[in-house]
């Protein structure tokens, strides 16, 4: 069995920044540090931070007064921000800057009284945060659609004063079809010059398509609640290649690889490389040889840290 590795894979700049914000807050202020929602959707990362003193909660009413709170990479609604400010909580915002970009777009449509359509998955924390940027008091409204059927059933007030945005971690192919359906039904709809799916999502989806074409089975390292990891598994399957979403090596079954010559491995944007290495070691123990890194797109994007958490230079 030969191992092939997708490139790029694993951590993106937004995830790197979010995890580093929690790490630095623990170093600078000491535990406990409260984090609203899992800072990123990866069990290994969350457990590591929990062991170091991070306390993960779903709502601010679970947070005591006079503590530090971090908002997760997925972003939060304006109502959550207002609640934190009203209580005087010290907040560090780990929202991915590319999610913040979508928030800014939605807030602008809200101020203009322009109806907005969000393409995304109901119940995902990023979607909840983005929907929560819209203030309907200016006369507009925001709607959530997931597929072409939702578009066909959607009723808006003014089809000539309408715009769309997207969740950042969707399937590019699926989203393109939904956007086409929106433009066909609402010819005057506005939107971003380029859809809001982030660079890392695009790059990892392109890479898994290449990987699936060169593999007999694909392993996607990522947690079940990770949107972008699930999209990678779906893409591989659409390419006709069996694919499995795994948290790590312990989730693998030896029988998956019977009569298999080529095993492809990728990782979602919130999965650390140490988990990929663990998968490789287990496969080698089962007889796999080598680990060929496929050619891919280089990523050199970084996002700045909050000023109070930046590492000071030693003089």
From Swiss-Prot:
It catalyses: isopentenyl diphosphate + 2 oxidized [2Fe-2S]-[ferredoxin] + H2O = (2E)-4-hydroxy-3-methylbut-2-enyl diphosphate + 2 reduced [2Fe-2S]-[ferredoxin] + 2 H(+); dimethylallyl diphosphate + 2 oxidized [2Fe-2S]-[ferredoxin] + H2O = (2E)-4-hydroxy-3-methylbut-2-enyl diphosphate + 2 reduced [2Fe-2S]-[ferredoxin] + 2 H(+). GO terms for molecular function: 4 iron, 4 sulfur cluster binding; 4-hydroxy-3-methylbut-2-enyl diphosphate reductase activity; metal ion binding. [4Fe-4S] cluster binds at residues 12, 96, 198. Its cofactor is [4Fe-4S] cluster. The keyword 4Fe-4S applies. It holds the Pfam family LYTB. Binds 1 [4Fe-4S] cluster per subunit. Belongs to the IspH family. This is 4-hydroxy-3-methylbut-2-enyl diphosphate reductase. It comes from Pseudomonas putida (strain ATCC 700007 / DSM 6899 / JCM 31910 / BCRC 17059 / LMG 24140 / F1). The lineage of its organism: Bacteria, Pseudomonadati, Pseudomonadota, Gammaproteobacteria, Pseudomonadales. The gene is ispH.
